[in-house]
Amino acid sequence: MDTILTNSKARHEYHIEETFEAGIVLSGTEVKSLRAGKGQIRDAFARVEDNEIWLYNAHIEEYSHGNTANHQPKAKRKLLLHKREISKLFGVAAIKGKALVPLSFYWKSGKVKVQLAVGRGKDAADKRQTIKKRDSDRELRQTMMRRR
């Protein structure tokens, strides 16, 4: 599993409850641009529409060697999941305070996959608590390394 893009903001903004692996419908120039590592999914989110899941605000830069048939950088893109997963996500997405956020894009058997997560939004106190825990864990690891 070779990671292409990661959403560093997702784990800071949301409590991740469940993850899914989804395929994504891309054009040739989008795949070439992703191979070059040109994109970001920091502001991306997914929505269920007509029993299909669509990814919004995923920015994949235009391919540098592309011609006039190049893709739109912020176009909505269809995610490919099984029907039972879509129906499960449809129920979850309807709950207030829950969101479908992409955690990463990665290669699997030559195809681009999306790690999609169900997240519940954090408030400011939760974010501060997460930062404190991360800092204390880092200090603990450093003291353990010094004692060796």
Short names for language-model regions:
Residues 28, 48-50, 57, 116-120:
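Flexible glycine-/small-residue-rich
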Residues 2-3, 117, 126:
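RNA pseudouridine synthases
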Residues 21, 31, 46, 60-61, ...:
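Residue-level signature for short turns and capping positions that connect secondary-structure elements
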Residues 2-48, 52:
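A positional/architectural concept
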Residues 80-117, 121-123:
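Beta-rich strand-turn-strand
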Residues 50, 58-93:
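Compact, glycine-rich, soluble single-domain proteins
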Residues 74, 81-87, 120-148:
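C-terminal end-helix/capping segment
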